[in-house]
Each structure stands twice: as C-alpha cells, then as structure tokens.
From Swiss-Prot:
UniProt xrefs under HAMAP family: Ribosomal_uL22_B (MF_01331_B)
Classification of source organism: Eukaryota, Glaucocystophyceae, Cyanophoraceae, Cyanophora
Keywords per UniProt: Cyanelle, Plastid, Ribonucleoprotein, Ribosomal protein, RNA-binding, rRNA-binding
Family as reported in the entry's similarity comment: Belongs to the universal ribosomal protein uL22 family.
Protein name: Large ribosomal subunit protein uL22c
Source organism superkingdom: Eukaryota
Task performed by this protein: This protein binds specifically to 23S rRNA. The globular domain of the protein is located near the polypeptide exit tunnel on the outside of the subunit, while an extended beta-hairpin is found that lines the wall of the exit tunnel in the center of the 70S ribosome.
PROSITE patterns in alphabetical order: RIBOSOMAL_L22
GO molecular function, one term: rRNA binding
Length: 114
C-alpha cells in the first residue's frame, strides 16, 4: 500500500472551474515536472497551486522522510466552497448581485519508489 501525503487549501478566492483545468494537467506528473509546468503557465491560479504542491512535498519530506525528487502527484481535486455575495449599486435604486466563488484545493503526493 502506497503512503500518500496531502496538502489542502481552503476558501481559495477563485472559481473551481479555473483551478480544475490546471489540476488536470499536473495530475500524475512528477514533483519536478509539476513545478516546472506551474511556473510557466499563464493562469493566476498557478501560483496558488504551486504553493499547495510545495506544501505537500514539504509535508512528505518532514512527516514520512520522502525525497522531493522522487515524489509524484497522485491525486488532485477541487471542491466548491461557499460563494461570497456582494451587491453593486445600479441606477434607480437597483442593485446587481455579484457572486465571488471560492474553492477548496487538495493535492496528494506519493513516493515513486513505493
């Protein structure tokens, strides 16, 4: 049985759809390859996901003694968080509803040698 270590970021102020398109590209890749991909992608969510991947690698190194260079991204998923609701004043006393989505991002890594 492979030991997996995870890192979770909750209430991230971005839409789950925008995060999911990035997570689909790094799932199954090695740690080094995922970091390289995230550093060159032009999306805002890449910097957030890069921090989570680094945190998962650090968790694996500290808690299980794994080598960062031998880690693979085994599972990644994003869940919808609560939506922040705001109102924008409009003409004639109206207000338009502005929805600001949040999400919870989970990244799991495991040692390649196991």
């Amino acid at each position: 049985m492979a030991t997996e270590v995870k890192a979770i970021a909750k209430y991230v102020r971005t839409s789950p759809q925008k995060v999911r398109r990035i997570l689909d590209q790094i799932r199954g890749k090695s740690y080094k390859e995922a970091v390289m991909l995230l550093s060159v992608m032009p999306y805002k969510a890449c910097s957030i996901i890069l921090k989570i991947v680094d945190s998962a690698a650090a968790n694996a190194q500290v808690t299980k003694g794994f080598n960062k260079n031998k880690l693979i991204i085994s599972k990644t998923f994003v869940d919808k968080g609560p939506t922040l609701k705001r109102f924008r004043p409009r003409a004639q006393g109206r207000g338009y509803k502005i929805l600001k989505p949040t999400c919870h991002i989970t990244v799991q890594v495991q040692d390649q040698s196991l």
